[in-house]
Amino acid sequence: SRKWKAVLTEFHLKSYPCRKYARHFLKQEPGPFMGLEAMGFTALGQSFPGKEWKGQTIRNYKEQRDIPSVQGTSRLSVHLRFGTISIRQLAAEAGGLNETFLNELIWRDFYQMILWHFPQVVGQAFKPEYDRIKWRNNEKEFAAWCAGNTGYPIVDAGMRELNSTGFMHNRVRMIVASFLTKHLLIDWRWGEAWFAK
């Protein structure tokens, strides 16, 4: 992140002037609007975090981000993922509040670039030798992991939170993913598919 910040200027944090380029887009009449249910989605009554960020959360991010029992994360990941909040605006505003938070935004963009330049990582390991891992892939253990019934309290709490709210604290996500792959020796793609579900 030091190299990234070394070349960062105010220009990079300004909103991109895309309106003047909109005339280059293909003009089409919109088709009928298809609702989420028609696409196979089911309303679960879950609410997404708002896209407003709290300065206090960002200020305390370094100290509180790894503590699952406090609201120490921004909960903006869904908005960053789908572009409903501007990464440039967030970096410009939040970067001055907490360097650690800015570093996390940089890491996010780094992995976006990995996906762009190495699209095979969607279904394969980045390092080919990791594709030779002999996974156990025990279906009973995987079902227990999915349900939050492993007997490991933090893993179970994280999976139950995910199953009931659609959210899991970042540090807990790392713990449950590591548990799945390194303790249970279950292929990471199984876990990824469950998280995407």
Provide a role label for each language-model segment.
Residues R2-Y130:
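Glycine/tryptophan-enriched, flexible segments
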Residues G72-K197:
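Active-site-proximal binding-pocket segments
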